[in-house]
Amino acid sequence: MYKLFTLLCFVFLFTKSAKSQTSDSTKVNSLEQQFSDSITQINEQNEHLKASRDAYNEGLFLLKNKNYNEAIPCFTKAIGIDSIFFQAYLSRAKCYEKSDDNLAIADYLKTFELDSTNLLPLYEVASLYLKTDKSLAKEMYTTILSLKGDEYLAISQLGVIAFMAEKYEVAEQLFTQSLVININAYTLNDRGSCYRKLDKLDLAISDYLAAIALNSNLAFIYSNLASVYAKQGETDKALIYYDLAISKDANYALAYNNKASVLLGENKFEKAKIEIDKALEADAEYAPAYNNKGVINHKMKKYKEAIAAFDKAIQIDVDYAKAYLNRGISKQMIRDEDGACFDWEKAKELGILMAKKYLANDCE
C-alpha cells in the first residue's frame, strides 16, 4: 500500500511538474513573441521616421535653393508620415508664403500648437497680417506679449503699426518701452523717425547717432539723419550723410534722390541731375526720382522733357499727387491750360492743398 501511495505521489508530482514546465514554456514563448513583435514595431517606426526625415531633408534642400513649389510636396510627405513633425510644418509655411498667405498662416499656427515654446511662428503670422490687415497684426503682437511680456520685438512692431497710422506720439512711447528692455539700432532709428515727424529734431539726431554707434552698416539710418539736417537747413551735413548712406549701399535709390533734392534746393541743377541718373540706374521704377527729374528739367526750362518725366512718375504711381501738381505747372508753361487744370484737379483730389491755389487763379 505504501509503495502504491509513493508511486501515485510520484506520478502526480511528475504530472504537475510537466504541466508547470509546459506553462513556463508557454510563458517564455509568449514573452519571446511579444519581444519580437516589439522589435518589429520599433523597426517599422524607425523606417517610417527615416522616410519622414528623408522627405524633410529633401524639402530643406529645395527650400534652400528657392525651389518653393517643389519643396512643398516633400514637407507634405514628411507630415503625412509624422503628423507631429512641427519642423516640417514650419518649413512648409515658409514655402507657402511665396504663393498663399492663408496656407502659410495655417501652418505657422499648427507649428505653434505643436511647440508652444517657440514664438517665431506667431511673429511670422503677425508679419503676414501686417501686409493686409494691421488690426489682426496688432492682435497677434498683443497675443505674443500676453504669453511673454518682455518680448521687445513685439513692442517695437506695435510701434511700427502706430507709426504707419501716423500716431507718432504713441509710436514713440512704444519704441521707448522696447528700448528699456533691449537697446538696438533698429528701434533707436524708429524712435528717431518719430521725433523727426514730431519736429523734435535734436532728439531725432541723438537717436540716429546712437543707432549708428551700435551698427554703422545700416544705410537707411545715415539717410534718415541726412534728412533731419536737410530739414534744419544744414545742407553740408545733409550731403555728407547722404554720401555715407550711399557708401553703405551703392544701389540706394532713395539716398541718391534725396541728395538730388538738396542740390536742387541750392540750384545746382547739373549736379542734381547726376544724382537722379544714379537713382534711376539703381531702380528704374523709382517714381520719386522721375518726379525730381521733371522738376530739374522744369527749372532748366525744358518743359516737354519735364512733362515726360512726370508722365513716367505717374505711370509708375497713379496716385502720385506731387507729380500731378508739377506736371500741371509744366503744362501751363507750354499753354496747355486744359491739361494743367486737369492735373491740378487730380492733385487736389489726392490731398495737395496748393493745387487749390492754381485752380482758383487759372482754372475758374
Feature map (PLM): residue ranges:
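Terminal, low-structured helical/coil segments at or just beyond the last alpha-helical repeat
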Residues: 24-48, 329-364
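Residue-level recognition of tetratricopeptide repeat
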Residues: 51, 85, 118, 151, ...
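Conserved alpha-helical positions within TPR/SEL1-like repeat arrays
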Residues: 56, 60, 87-94, 120-127, ...
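Structural motif corresponding to the intra-repeat A-B loop/turn of tetratricopeptide repeats
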Residues: 65, 98-99, 131-132, 165, ...
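Canonical positions in the second alpha-helix
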Residues: 78, 110-111, 143-144, 177-178, ...
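Structural marker of alpha-solenoid helical repeat scaffolds
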Residues: 81, 114, 147, 180-181, ...
